[in-house]
Amino acid sequence: MTVMQNAANKAAKRLLRDFMEVENLQVSVKGPGDFVSQADMRAEATLREELEKARPGYGLLMEESGASGSDKWAWRWIVDPLDGTTNFLHGIPHWAISIALEKRLPDGGSEINAAIVYCPVNGEMFWAEKGVGAYLNDRRLRVSARRDFKEALFATGIPFAATSAGNRLAFARTLGALMPATAGVRRFGSAALDLAWVAAGRYDGYWEMGIKPWDIAAGMLIVREAGGYATDGEGKDNIDSVVVAANPHLHPKLLELVRDGLAAKQG
């Protein structure tokens, strides 16, 4: 945990400097609605350097540079150096550094053993270790206890042009079912923080389609260690392109609505 937090703190210093001079950053386009800036690349380079120095035998899966290290890794870092790039580039102070530590299991599967989601703008460090619990800085986290869907506040990510038409259709159906049945749906633009906020009880649930592993690997563990459920679109513990997270009372219904939406995509 100390390794992850130290690496994130070092990358955060540079990101905060870049955020204050965001209009001077060079920006390129990876795809429709998908941007990468000098800030992303510099933060990723810092995180890579710090993590490799501390744990030289570990694998790496990073948003901008992909997978590196041995294919036979026993442990691997999953890193998003800047989750919420579009917010960052527009001067919106809602973005985060996300780091997860993945362990390979004897059966060939894997699990996330430790995670942090760090928002440098306000100094909130969400973190969790498997079996130890989830924390915001030094305060223990618990998901909300809300049971009534009509009183629940949800978060999501909107699939833009970079995602498939099927994902957009599935999202529209799920959102259409949720909007009249809840207290509201928010879209703030950082999957890692959305999950961390579910763990903190700020949101009662969150779902997204067309997501990447580095966006959600850390946040899913934080939700689970805070007493919530974080699954794929089938209700399994996999890190997949669909994520559904909520407190234990609301997750079954949210998952049902997401499945209904995904059925529209397949149809």
Where do the protein language model's features map onto the residues?
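N-terminal subdomain of lithium-sensitive/metallo-dependent phosphomonoesterases centered on the IMPase/IPPase/PAP
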Residues: 1-82, 259, 263-267
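Short acidic/glycine-enriched loop/turn segments that link adjacent beta-strands
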Residues: 32, 122, 237-240
